[in-house]
Amino acid sequence: MVRGKLIFSIISLLMPWVAAPVGAQSQQPLTPEQAAAAMPDDAEAVPADEVEETVETVKLGGEDKTTVQEGVQQAESYEDTVAPDSPTNVEIGGGGGEEVTTPPLKTDEEVMDPTVHDPSRVAYASTRPNARTMSLTVPGPRGLITDRDGHVMACSEVAWQPAINFGQLKDESEANILSIARKTIGAFEAAGFKVLEKTDSQLLDHYRNRRWLPLAIGPTVRERELKPLREKVKQIEYSHLIPLYIRNYTSGMTACHILGYTGAKAKLPTGPINHNDPIFERQEGRAGLELKFNKQLTGKPGIWRLMFDESGNKILDELQTKPKPGGTIVTTLNLEWQKAAEQSLKKNTLGRGAFVMVDVRTGEIVVLASAPNFDPNKFIPAISQKDYDDLRNDPNTPLVSRAFAGVYPPASTFKTITVAAALRYGIISENTYVNCPFSVRIGNHDFKNHSKFTGSINCVTALVLSNNPFMYQVAATRTPHLGAQRLCDIARRFGYGSTADIPLPDKAGNVPDENWMHRSYGRGFMAGDAANLSIGQGALLATPLQVAHAISGIANGKYLPKLQLVRQVLDAEGNVVYQFTPAVQTNLSDMENALAIVRKGMKAVVNGGTGRRAKLSYVSNAGKTGTAQWGRPSDDCRLAWFAGFMPAEEPRYAYAALYEGKPHQRISGGHMAATVVREFFESIKTSMQAALTVPQAGAAEVPTDELTEEERLMKEQEEAAEAAEAAAQEVRQREQEKRRSRSGWDDGRSRR
């Protein structure tokens, strides 16, 4: 006979569907079409000229001192995998926007214990003047995390723990208590449950101090796992199933680095029952959005009341206050596209890469995918040490998001910034043709091209061919030229070198300045640094999120939008407590003409240049390839990029794809990364076509303060003075390089 059991009435959430200048200009410059005609057209093999897009960074001295780390760094412990636990500041925004409501609550679970809610017992208890009342807390279910359309990605569900329910035994001898406990544990194990080791002292201590509460003797079991075992449980004397809330990540591994995971806030108390003891473990966010919005997601606890008579016998237990669910976090992600991106990475990479897509007008992040990933459900309710060690020791670092926490040289994708900067400062125009040899001599170093091409080209063709000597010259050797400082200043305007201010632990990457150079290399900027930076190498490091963000500014043409990952935060009643509003991060109105020319070059890259493998069947596309060495030189590893925007004529989305190669692998952005892009967009053809027919969401308001004539003249004078100072600084740098060369310093070794 099954003993009377303490059954907690519990509320569950319904599962919703759930270099020196080389000649000024050739007499016969190449057009983009002529340049593209010379490109190989093999769509499968990796042509030599694409593979050789990788050009090793030229070391000018002091580089061995630097502490900048590329790639991803694995956490050393469980605690290191989570972001710092700081309070979440949620701005109170205006209402409006898409309404998302929390799902309705189920009715109370059936209560089988006749003492619960029994009016006669309540009346009897009220007549006992010496009765003691004890209130316990019932942790509330955590709220939902959804995609932009309300599709649930994380929710709470009811699960069960096998337990012993002693109650008040007539025979309270230690032998009888232990006999009952061991028989019950054995019966659960025979029924197919996993059980936990319990010592005799633990069993006896629980009976003496907490016998009116069930003792969990096994790990949590989800409803689908429990279903075939329920009938067996009914036959086990002193058995009990403790209902509790646990987290369910409905799409498994999808968006795991964004969602994060939860863990027990503290172990259940032992010893005598105290007021406000939880009846099961409280869960708290440990990583990702679960951590950042832990306060908003945490449910409001209910109150369970126990009453004992003067002899210590339980005379009443009831749910006095129902627990309430937490709020809802509505992200900017598109769940379908997120899944498609992760699938494309899995299919078209060696298991290591990233894909990011951003709305170019609103800054909403619609895809933030990284490979490899992990199943956050393994952390629920607690991950085993073995499973965690397997994840932590995996050389592919699945716990780290390459999309926002991996830093890499942006390689030739950064040439879009170099060209934009050169156009912005008047170093070149679209009609400026530069004679480009195979290599450019800067100081005592030869800065080479990735192919044997030579000729006179303009900036559009330079992007099509991904030509290095063009970039070297406009950045370092032409008169006038950009210089490293101005190039880095422009890079920062496009989001490089700083975190994105999203609710995730993203990395800032690195954009050097004079102070950084002195701290890291023991010297200031040199002309060779400008050359290295111009092709996205040297000390420049960025995340895939930053690269996609920068491209969104180019595609937008007027401003760099502020990135957003959360659309709305709702309270438990469905009231909007935060509403996303598009915002401008950087006003780029002074670069509109320059960015239009860059977009022209990026269109040509896909139509016939190094990025033609990214061409789509149903919509125009534009982009830029990139390939670079990264990591330790001894590893001989390369990475491939493809970053762009679509549609090419009226840009809606900017994106960046990253492919991490294995040691000694011959790769190129135009082959590997472009394939990731094409496979992704073709797989979402139907939904993307539908999305492109919907009017685009409102853009951010760009400041339009017009300058007075006096202010305009002052601005021109400031820019002229800035250009003169930059030119003078370059002259000083060249003089320094000559002196160092005479003293034998610039042989590449660090200054001692």
Listing of model-derived features with the role each one plays in the protein:
Residues 154, 308-320, 359-412, 417-663, ...:
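Beta-lactam-recognizing serine transpeptidase/beta-lactamase-like catalytic domain environment
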Residues 1-26:
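Sec-dependent N-terminal signal peptides
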Residues 576-577, 581, 671-736:
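Short, gly/Ser/Thr-rich active-site loops of penicillin-recognizing serine hydrolases
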Residues 71-73, 77-80, 84-87, 91-106, ...:
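Small/polar-residue-rich segments within soluble enzyme cores
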Residues 132, 137-141, 301, 349-353, ...:
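Short, small/polar residue-rich loop motifs at catalytic or cofactor-binding pockets
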Residues 280-307, 351-377, 487:
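Carboxylate/His-rich catalytic cores and anion/metal-binding grooves
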Residues 313-353:
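Conserved, well-ordered alpha-helix/loop/beta-strand core segments that scaffold catalytic motifs
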Residues 26-78, 742-752:
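N-terminal propeptides/low-complexity segments immediately following signal peptides
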